């Protein structure tokens, strides 16, 4: 019990004591110092404009800051929503403002609008992530860092006079936890005052019924509580934008000229432009910056740190130190890393085994195919060798026959060349015999006929020539034997 009390008293903070000063110290100049430092450093303010193409976003920005921003003409044929940021350096008196206007180009122009809000949400989260990464650096320089976090979203509502579109409700519901939303009815001069009043009531009722949280001007500061409470009742603001100057009476005012009359931008009886400018720039700009940092960014930061495993205390409400959390997460990540490495190693081993089996199977198939081709090749080679031997045998036989035929032809020609001499000799002998033996004339004529029947033949091809020459040889042999 005593230990518990001691621990309780040791952890309790002492009550501050109020003391009076004996003279002037000087810390009453702290506000002046802060103002001087802020003026030297300058301010940044980032506005996100969401609305359909051609609804008047660029015109309203030019009217709000009383200048002309150079912007590209938007197209109605964008394939998807595209965020286009443009940064400008403005100066009023001795105050510098780095103004960034982010336009949601192509919003609402697609046939399928289910994911039209996604690029906007991703852009806002990306700016939060950039700031978080800068904060987590060991050597951070937030003083020189250009803060691109969105401070306010001006949501432009089409003046239909009936109700909000489903796209508007879904988009604002997705954005209300990430950015300060101020709904605006654009081109309010296109509907009558009675319709505009009913339209405002209808919009606020739909926002409340669907749980959409828009930015409420703060009423906790006594200096602005009254005016902010009045302006909260005028939401959403019905505005008209114009950069043209029209002469009304004896002065030039920004207005829109119509055949039926003139709509003055800064006339509160015509539209809520002045109310919007007062609430957005002159009264609540710093509160919008503070709400972005302390509410929306802190929510994003907390979610990110919880995803990383950081928390303020355990289940017993014991505070965790950053070192303990880091060590715990480090051990957890190392064990997870080892488990993943083991799984990957096992997967690699299994994959290697499967690959080896596949390679062995492929190798076996290739060997079988090679052996088959080898056998086919050997069989073809054997057949070719047999054909070659048969051809050589036929060639040799042909050469032998050719040589024999040539020899026989030469003999036949030689024998034929001896025939005239024999004829003369035989003629002479027959004449002698005829003179002595007259009965031999018939047989002599037969012999001459036999000789005449064995003349050489002319053959056109070699095989018939061989046959004919063979017959000739036989006839010649018979004739020689006969003679």
From Swiss-Prot:
PROSITE patterns: G_SEPTIN. Residues 1-22, 411-443 are annotated as: Disordered. Its main location: cytoplasm. Residues 103-106 are annotated as: G3 motif. CDD domains: CDC_Septin. GTP binds at residues 51-58, 106, 187-195, 241, 256. Residues 1-16, 421-433 have a biased composition (Basic and acidic residues). It comes from Homo sapiens (Human). PANTHER family: SEPTIN (PTHR18884). Residues 41-307 form the Septin-type G domain. One of its GO terms (molecular function) is GTPase activity. The lineage of its organism: Eukaryota, Metazoa, Chordata, Craniata, Vertebrata. GO terms for cellular component: axon; cell division site; microtubule cytoskeleton; presynapse; septin complex; septin ring; synaptic vesicle membrane. The modification N-acetylalanine is found at residue 2. Filament-forming cytoskeletal GTPase. May play a role in platelet secretion. Seems to participate in the process of SNARE complex formation in synaptic vesicles. The keyword Cytoplasm applies. The keyword DNA-binding does not apply. Residues 411-420 have a biased composition (Polar residues). This is Septin-8.
